[in-house]
Amino acid sequence: MPRFAHIFEAAADTLNAYYQAVAEVNIDSLMGLWIDEEFASCIWADGSHLHGLDNIRAGLAIQLEALPVSIEPIDIRVYDSLGTVVYAIAEAHRPADPKATPSMVFTTYVMVHERGEWKIAHIHASAMPNEAANQFAAKMRHGQGSLH
C-alpha cells in the first residue's frame, strides 16, 4: 500500500475514536481528538453553534450527559488532500435509552494533519428530514446504496 494511503487510514482511526468516545461519554478522550486551536468549531444537529475548545467541551458535556448516544455511520463519503480530510456521513444516532427515538443525521467532519496526527477542526451536523430518512432507509433495504 502506498505510504500516503496509510496517512488517510489514520484519519479514519480518529473518526472511529470519536464514535467510541461519544458512546462512552468520555469528554476527555473526545477533546483529545480536536485540533489545539481556538478556531475549532462544532454545529450540532439541533442548530447549536460552538466555537473554541472551551465551548466545545462544555457543549459536549451538556449534550452527551443529557442524551448519551451511539453513532453508526451508514454511508461515508471521503474527500481528501495532503493535509485535510473531509468526511460526509449519513449517521444513525441511537440514544442509550431504549425508549428514546433514534435519529438520522448528516454530519461533516473536517480533519487536519497536525504534528503527525489527524485532529478534528470542525463538525457540522444537520438533522435528516423524515422524508429523506425514509427514502434513505428504503434504498438501503433494496440494496441500491444510500445515495443512488
Which residues are covered by each model-predicted region?
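Hydrophobic pocket/interface hotspot
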Residues: 18, 30-31, 40, 52, ...
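Short, low-complexity N-terminal intrinsically disordered segments enriched in polar/charged residues
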Residues: 1-33, 42, 139-148
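Structural motif
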Residues: 36, 79-82, 114
